[in-house]
């Protein structure tokens, strides 16, 4: 007997998941996608299995804007284990080196200024970056080490929250592409004792905070009680991650032409940059870019939600 193909639902929006420990970002995404029975899904940048916290999951039309969330700043809290280095720069790797820990709070506070502002990082081998189409972590698992180009990142804030024994808890605000494992490892080297990430929690991604997240257990319970559609109440609008962008409201006439790919003018448009656009009925219809001629060109269009 032929298996009946599951018909997925066309749902759109963003769910802010508090990613559980031990899950890859994709595994968490696929689990929530199954709970929603959503046709299209994507996440906004990976969190290591070791990490927990804010993971925006995009569904349907919201996937068109996931890149802009990927490019946003992030905030983390991390527990650094001092005195050891590992192959992965976190607790999941094998210990490479053990050194005595003779530093205290004052020593840690003294080195942190070296890691604030614009700094250079060499991405870890255990990362999703690719070399000739192959993820670096796969090469690392095969025992290969390849040269990686340093990358410039910005550490907007780096604070020591607590220091107890051979651990230090840090709070970090950083730009996209920052590797907290590398940051902790570099701090450990500066201290002379080495360090790795024992715990990592993302507390903010772009405009989204932990207070807005929902746990996988909560989603599973709601699904068990009410099915796929009951989970819809956790969906935020597709433009939720873009609320700090200028908002333009088009007339019915302008909306028609813009949705057909034509640049249009708006009297209240900024002189340059990206904008959110609503139609004459207040529906989000996409994002645009203000050109040199003052017209707003469509960049990503959305079907009415």
Curated annotation (Swiss-Prot):
GO terms for molecular function: RNA binding; tRNA pseudouridine(55) synthase activity. CDD domains: PseudoU_synth_EcTruB, PUA_TruB_bacterial. It comes from the Bacteria. InterPro entries: PsdUridine_synth_cat_dom_sf, PsdUridine_synth_N, PUA-like_sf, PUA_sf, tRNA_psdUridine_synth_TruB, tRNA_sdUridine_synth_fam1_C, TruB_C. Gene3D superfamilies: Pseudouridine synthase (3.30.2350.10), PUA domain (2.30.130.10). Its EC number is 5.4.99.25. This is tRNA pseudouridine synthase B. Keywords: Isomerase, tRNA processing. It catalyses: uridine(55) in tRNA = pseudouridine(55) in tRNA. Belongs to the pseudouridine synthase TruB family. Type 1 subfamily. GO terms for biological process: mRNA pseudouridine synthesis; tRNA pseudouridine synthesis. It comes from Pseudomonas savastanoi pv. phaseolicola (strain 1448A / Race 6) (Pseudomonas syringae pv. phaseolicola (strain 1448A / Race 6)). Responsible for synthesis of pseudouridine from uracil-55 in the psi GC loop of transfer RNAs. SUPFAM superfamilies: Pseudouridine synthase (SSF55120), PUA domain-like (SSF88697).
């Amino acid at each position: 007997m032929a298996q009946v193909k599951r018909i997925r639902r066309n749902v759109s929006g963003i769910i802010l998941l508090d990613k559980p420990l031990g899950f890859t970002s994709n595994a968490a995404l696929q689990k929530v996608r199954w709970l929603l029975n959503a046709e299209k899904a994507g996440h906004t940048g990976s969190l290591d299995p070791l990490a927990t916290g804010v993971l925006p999951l995009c569904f349907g039309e919201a996937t068109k804007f996931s890149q802009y969330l990927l490019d946003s700043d992030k905030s983390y809290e991390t527990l650094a284990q001092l005195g050891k280095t590992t192959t992965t720069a976190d607790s999941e790797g094998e210990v490479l080196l053990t050194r005595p820990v003779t530093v205290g709070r004052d020593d840690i506070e003294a080195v942190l200024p070296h890691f604030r502002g614009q700094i250079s990082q060499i991405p870890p081998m255990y990362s999703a970056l690719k070399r000739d189409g192959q993820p670096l972590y796969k090469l690392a698992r095969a025992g290969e080490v390849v040269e990686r180009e340093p990358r410039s990142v910005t550490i907007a804030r780096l604070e020591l929250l607590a220091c107890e024994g051979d651990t230090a808890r840090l709070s970090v605000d950083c730009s996209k592409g920052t590797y907290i494992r590398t940051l902790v490892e570099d701090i450990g080297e500066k201290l002379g004792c080495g360090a790795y990430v024992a715990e990592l929690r993302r507390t903010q991604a772009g405009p989204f905070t932990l207070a807005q997240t929902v746990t996988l257990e909560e989603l599973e319970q709601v699904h068990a009680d009410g099915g796929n559609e009951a989970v819809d109440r956790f969906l935020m609008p597709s433009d939720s991650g873009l609320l700090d962008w200028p908002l333009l409201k088009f007339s019915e006439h302008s909306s028609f032409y813009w949705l057909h790919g034509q640049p249009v003018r708006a009297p209240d448009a900024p002189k340059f940059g990206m904008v959110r656009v609503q139609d004459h009925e207040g529906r989000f219809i996409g994002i645009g870019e203000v050109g040199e001629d003052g017209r707003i060109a469509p960049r990503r269009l959305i079907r009415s939600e």
